[in-house]
Amino acid sequence: MISVLIISKNDEDVIGDAIKSVNDLADEIIVVDGGSSDKTSEIAEKAGARVVKNKFKNFADQRNLAATFAHGDWIFYLDSDERATPRF
């Protein structure tokens, strides 16, 4: 099982594409939203991700929090402005 973890804040313009790029790869997609004031969470949920809301402290804490929700044997971190390519 593969868990894809995405840390995000105010990324409504890119989060949907990031999630779509891993939909066929991931068994679960978890987005940690660090307090967005835009529609990042709603877009992520509609794209199929589980959204965890948490006030942003720092990048490392957000990643560690995301890992506590993951159930996969493998964890893949993807930044919200990145895309997994088909060759991945």
What are these regions (language model features)?
Residues 75:
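Short aromatic/hydrophobic "clamp" motif used to bind/position activated sugar donors
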Residues 55-70:
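Glycine-rich, basic loop-to-helix element that forms the pyrophosphate-binding segment
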Residues 21, 33-42, 79:
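A conserved acidic beta->alpha catalytic loop
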Residues 39, 60, 78-88:
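Acidic donor-binding/catalytic loop of UDP-sugar-dependent glycosyltransferases
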Residues 16, 38-47, 87:
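Acidic helix N-cap motif at the loop->helix transition within catalytic regions
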Residues 27, 49:
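Receiver (REC) domain switch/active-site residues of two-component response regulators
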Residues 1-24:
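N-proximal low-complexity "stem/linker" segments adjacent to membrane-targeting elements
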